[in-house]
UniProtKB/Swiss-Prot annotation:
It catalyses: L-glutamyl-tRNA(Gln) + L-glutamine + ATP + H2O = L-glutaminyl-tRNA(Gln) + L-glutamate + ADP + phosphate + H(+); L-aspartyl-tRNA(Asn) + L-glutamine + ATP + H2O = L-asparaginyl-tRNA(Asn) + L-glutamate + ADP + phosphate + 2 H(+). The lineage of its organism: Bacteria, Bacillati, Cyanobacteriota, Cyanophyceae, Synechococcales. HAMAP family: GatC (MF_00122). One of its GO terms (biological process) is glutaminyl-tRNAGln biosynthesis via transamidation. This is Aspartyl/glutamyl-tRNA(Asn/Gln) amidotransferase subunit C. It comes from Prochlorococcus marinus (strain MIT 9215). It comes from the Bacteria.
């Protein structure tokens, strides 16, 4: 891997529409070089016996059966709203027909 130079930082900044002063260019070049050094270290790690994965931890979906439950405090909840009509909250219209 090649080293990051100031011209490459300027080019990336231009593509990203960033205006960087000389101090920022130098700082970003140094930071990017440190990142690339870290990547170079990672490239040296032997991963031949490591199984491929997309996550660090296993993701398990937990499914449950949907069950209808009666709720006996509907009236109490409707009283908390600013406006209601029958057994529904009444809200301002936001879309035209």
């Amino acid at each position: 891997m090649s080293r990051i130079n100031k011209e490459e930082v300027k080019k990336v900044a231009q593509l990203a529409r960033l205006e960087l002063n000389i101090n920022e260019i130098n700082n970003h070049a140094e930071q990017l070089e440190k990142i690339l050094d870290y990547i170079r270290q990672l490239e040296k790690i032997d991963t031949d016996n490591v199984p491929c994965t997309t996550r660090a931890i296993e993701v398990i979906n937990v499914f449950r059966k949907d069950e209808k439950k009666n709720y006996d405090r509907t009236e109490e909840l409707l009283e908390l709203g600013p406006s209601r009509e029958d057994k529904y909250f009444k809200v301002p219209k936001i879309m035209n027909e």
